[in-house]
Design a protein with these regions (language model features):
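Compositionally biased, low-complexity flexible segments
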Residues: 1-20, 27-31, 35, 39-42
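Solvent-exposed, flexible loop/coil residues
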Residues: 5, 75, 139, 143
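Charged, low-complexity surface segments at secondary-structure and domain boundaries
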Residues: 40, 67-72, 120-121, 174-175
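Short, extreme N-terminal leader segments that mark the start of a protein/domain
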Residues: 41-71
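Compact, well-ordered interaction domains used in eukaryotic information-processing assemblies
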Residues: 48, 70-128
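Generic structural hydrophobic/aromatic packing signal, biased to beta-strands
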Residues: 56-58, 98, 135
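Charged, compositionally biased boundary regions
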Residues: 127-209
Length: 209
């Protein structure tokens, strides 16, 4: 099955779904949403830029355990804003952010001091989505041409989670699985990295499921 651009679709005929705990994350979201509204008023972004993102979550380390929070989709209106949102969160060993758009693509970003690592599940998403296009620009990778859209290929640092135990081949295999929704791909990665429960809760909040 292919999408409107003739690319293989990521979505399978049945979404396995996930059960999770739902809580109030207004306190977490408030600061980020306020920053977004100020930027929107200044003309830096529009609601149409934001609406394409289905979820954004942040993962960070506190003493001896992992924490994860849902973020407003507004923080992924542009890549710089997403990175800055991750930098604002104090953490032992840096922060990780995940974002997903429909059944098209997902993005992982790790921030440690001034170092930023990124992994984009499908570089052809840059044809349609500004966030994906900005990732390719940051990686100095050209946006695919029309005759390069037949194959879904990832872009970025395949070793982004190698220090946490996820090898390059494993991450590549997740990105290549066209039957996974972005949220399920992210949940699977998080489980492998031993912060699965925290990310599941954050995804449930972000997706309202």
């Amino acid at each position: 099955v292919r999408d409107g651009r003739g690319r293989p679709r990521r979505r399978s005929s049945q979404n396995p779904g996930r059960d999770g705990l739902i809580g109030d994350f207004a306190a977490v979201a408030g600061g980020y949403l306020t920053a977004f509204l100020r930027a929107e008023h200044a003309g830096a972004m529009t609601m149409s830029d934001v609406s394409e993102t289905d979820f954004a979550v942040i993962v960070y380390r506190e003493e001896d355990h992992w924490e994860a929070d849902a973020l407003p989709a507004a923080v992924t209106a542009d890549l710089d804003g997403f990175v800055q949102a991750l930098r604002r969160q104090p953490s032992i060993g840096g922060t990780t952010g995940f974002a997903g758009v429909g059944d098209d693509f997902w993005l992982a970003v790790r921030v440690l001091g001034e170092d930023v690592s990124m992994f984009l599940s499908d570089l052809t998403a840059a044809v349609d989505y500004p966030l994906a296009r900005q990732v390719l620009e940051a990686l100095d990778i050209p946006v695919p041409s029309d005759d390069e859209l037949d194959q879904v290929l990832p872009a970025g640092d395949l070793s982004i989670f190698a220090d946490l135990g996820l090898e390059e081949m494993e991450l590549g295999a997740v990105a290549a699985d066209l039957d996974l929704y972005p949220e399920d791909a992210v949940a699977g990665i998080a489980e492998r990295l031993r912060f699965g429960e925290a990310v599941e809760r954050a995804l449930d909040l972000a997706l309202g499921s």
